[in-house]
Amino acid sequence: MSGLIPQPFIDDLLNRTDLVELIDGYVPLKKRGNSHIACCPFHNEKTPSFNVVAKKQFYHCFGCGASGNAISFVMNYLNQGFTDAVETLRRAWVKCPRDGTGEKHKSSLNLYNLMSEVSQYYQKKLKYNGQVAIDYLRNRGLSGEIAKRYHLGYAPEGWHNLEKAFPNNQRELLSTGMLIKSDEGKIYDRYRNRIMFPIHDRNGRVIGFGGRVLDKDQKPKYLNSPETVLFQKSRELYGLHQVLSQQKNPDSIIVVEGYMDVIALAQHGIFNVVATLGTATSTFHIQLLAKHTKHLIFCFDGDAAGKQAAWRALESSLPHLNAGLDAGFIFLPNEHDPDSLVRNEGKNGFLELLQQATPLHRFFFDTLSKDINLSNPAGKTQLINAVKPYLQKMVEGSYKQLLIDDLSRLTHIESHRLTNLITDKSESKPEVQAAISRSPLRIAIALLLQNPEIYSIAIQQINPALLHEQEHHILLKLLQQLKDKPNANTATLIEFWRNSSYFELIVKLAAWDHQVPEQELTKEFIDVLLFLQKQNREILIRQYIEKSRKTGLTEAERLSLQNLLKERHGQAEIEK
């Protein structure tokens, strides 16, 4: 992105973004009082000191001092520049305008709406022009009801069907990956002669597609949408929307590897199934699933690749086990996938297999202890060293202790001794943040940044015109910000200063412990402002008196001095 992004757009973007939801997508948060906490993603710690306050749309780590709003988080966590962070945050329906274009930026067709229309187009093609696809689905034992539940469609043969169906949306279809532009500049449909599987986000919006070939000579067998502003495959799960629309918090969720596995199991009445989208099971996938269930069952092939995929899922699950999540693993016979197995064995046969799932802790130790002789000290040492790095990644809690107890039974070493051996002594210590010296001006700025709602009451009792234009520059700017936008929050207030030399100080003051009790915030702010006004008034009086002695005052200066002296006298009478 190039050009300047207008401040009103940035403010609107920050107001639209839910900081808790944003950060929770990367770092699992736990609600505590009026805020959410986690172990800081910016330094190594085991005791949570990272704090996110929804009301302020602001985060702060009490350990390392990392602080900011949604844009700051994306910049620092994803290592992005400012404009890329804005692009990451913006919703698909928000156009990102530029200053100086001299044009009104008309909103194009909403990308989500467009993808929904594309899905409907493919569904109609399946119904009216897709006999070859219908025959294939019937041969796989799939009913029209299941095809409708998952909105299956058909992309007919030909290079330009979709392009012709949406002649006014070529640019949007290119951006969502539905059309491809060749090196020679030719544009054509990505999907041709394929069964189409629309991919929904958890809110039910179509964000991408998967396509399965009908011609066995065509490659690849399955083709996913590319990464786009709507679709990041490592953050989505096929079928999750359908699972949650039927039951918000199912007892368990089964994780498989393919679309057809999800649909085949649904055909047999097993609906709590999701699939990864050609990627390993990620930490984000586990975070997402852990919000809706406490039990995961991973269903993989029994070959080496399946075992490797299962181990990656285990690694992603470990940090979440202390929160009550549990997981089991099913390894299918080599000649089967979930689709073929449920067709051969039926629903009951598959459910029986689920009951035999290997618990996570057993899979964990079976894998790490394989080929290790635990009857001698060398073997026990090998196992401890193999287990250690995994347990060190887990926060303290009951599940971690249970794993240590299992290790104790295997090695015949007491649990407390193993705990001492495994405890990470190298936890990084964050840099000690330099204390901010207290001053009335800094207290006023901090109070206003952290509690902008006090402005509407305080402004009735203070006179910003009596503040010093240079000495109180930041405070005056903040007051002006709130005059222009009375509903501003901490996030938008600090964003105004991003390109200023004061930005670092502003962010620190937004997180500063000013030690003012909540019930006294407004009174304290008014008292500090009145003190600053009085301080500035005395400076001006001294300057005028000194000038009158040296060169004399102009008429305007003489009147100004008289008014200041009257204010001083009036204030003195009030304070008697």
UniProtKB/Swiss-Prot annotation:
GO terms for cellular component: cytoplasm; DNA-directed RNA polymerase complex; primosome complex. The keyword Transcription applies. Mg(2+) 1 binds at residues 257, 301. Contains an N-terminal zinc-binding domain, a central core domain that contains the primase activity, and a C-terminal DnaB-binding domain. Signal peptide: none annotated. One of its GO terms (biological process) is DNA replication, synthesis of primer. RNA polymerase that catalyzes the synthesis of short RNA molecules used as primers for DNA polymerase during DNA replication. Monomer. Interacts with DnaB. Residues 251-333 form the Toprim domain. Its EC number is 2.7.7.101. This is DNA primase. Belongs to the DnaG primase family. Keywords: DNA replication, DNA-binding, DNA-directed RNA polymerase, Magnesium, Metal-binding, Nucleotidyltransferase, Primosome, Transcription, Transferase, Zinc, Zinc-finger. It catalyses: ssDNA + n NTP = ssDNA/pppN(pN)n-1 hybrid + (n-1) diphosphate. Its cofactor is Zn(2+); Mg(2+). It comes from Legionella pneumophila. One of its GO terms (molecular function) is DNA binding. It comes from the Bacteria. The lineage of its organism: Bacteria, Pseudomonadati, Pseudomonadota, Gammaproteobacteria, Legionellales. Binds 1 zinc ion per monomer. Binds two Mg(2+) per subunit. SMART domains: DnaG_DnaB_bind (SM00766), TOPRIM (SM00493), ZnF_CHCC (SM00400). Mg(2+) 2 binds at residues 301, 303. Coiled coil: none annotated. A zinc finger (CHC2-type) spans 40-64.
